[in-house]
């Protein structure tokens, strides 16, 4: 599998499914509240991979990594501030990533107005496909030797 269980490399999807699936699994609507899931995707995620001193939050001495989100997009509305705030729940449950207008990595803008500024999408796609082919070629023999249910289904062209 190339990505997490939901077959998506989209962090917004991962946040949503983390919250929803755990509520179902534990049959508890209070488990994994939105603020906690957002924290897991940022500060706690950085800490989990050993980079908490470099990324995960905006602090002096850390890399300036951030995204800007257009909260005027319909799927993120309505936006409430009083008596309750719903920006974090909107991000976790309703965002899909298309609302990201700006991305800064280590203080350098790499996406502005929703467009890549640092590289070409075609080049990224080409390099990703080339890298994937190399990985598959290296793993193919072991993959088939496992004779897993998924491998069998692929051999039968069922998936």
What is each of the regions a protein language model found here?
Residues 117, 122-126, 130, 137, ...:
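C-terminal regulatory/interaction regions
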